Swiss-Prot record:
Key words of the record: ATP-binding, Cytoplasm, Kinase, Magnesium, Metal-binding, Nucleotide metabolism, Nucleotide-binding, Phosphoprotein, Transferase
Reactions that this protein is recorded to catalyse: a 2'-deoxyribonucleoside 5'-diphosphate + ATP = a 2'-deoxyribonucleoside 5'-triphosphate + ADP; a ribonucleoside 5'-diphosphate + ATP = a ribonucleoside 5'-triphosphate + ADP
Source organism phylogeny: Bacteria, Pseudomonadati, Pseudomonadota, Gammaproteobacteria, Enterobacterales
Protein name (Swiss-Prot/TrEMBL): Nucleoside diphosphate kinase
NCBIfam families (alphabetical): PRK00668.1
Length: 143
């Protein structure tokens, strides 16, 4: 099976809970290699650009407000079948439906403040990685 890359966000509510290290440890325990990561505080323009596909939906403004309410941690993760394995680790988007032991079951506060984001396809992963990471900011792991 081919090695894939996926994109992950630790959202403002999870950053505020000081669980970044715990989430990274769970990524690594699940066999992911972290090949790029940074902390940043999204501007309104960045949040609107990243979530542009949701523009016009009833939850869009609240999502932008939440995602700009504090710092986030964006990461590029690498493993076999990375997109699906990462989504399985995150759990259901709605934490009320997330299985015990998933990141959203453990760290989400609500549907909007669900703690984490993960790419839903390889195409989304490529687009999302390119949104946050420039040339040379993702480092292939050779060891």
């Amino acid at each position: 099976m081919a090695i894939e890359r996926t994109f992950s966000i630790i959202k403002p509510n999870a950053v505020a809970k000081n669980v970044i290290g715990s989430i990274f440890a769970r990524f690594e325990a699940a066999g992911f290699k972290i090949v790029g990561t940074k902390m940043l505080h999204l501007t309104v323009e960045q949040a609107r650009g990243f979530y542009a596909e949701h523009d016009g939906k009833p939850f869009f403004d609240g999502l932008v407000e939440f995602m700009t309410s504090g710092p986030i941690v964006v990461s590029v993760l690498e493993s076999e079948n990375a997109v699906q394995r990462h989504r399985d680790l995150l759990g259901a988007t709605n934490p009320a439906n997330a299985l015990a032991g998933t990141l959203r079951a453990d760290y989400a506060d609500s549907l909007t403040e669900n703690g984490t984001h993960g790419s839903d396809s390889l195409e989304s992963a490529q687009r999302e990685i390119a949104f946050f990471f420039g040339e040379g900011e993702v480092c292939p792991r050779t060891r």
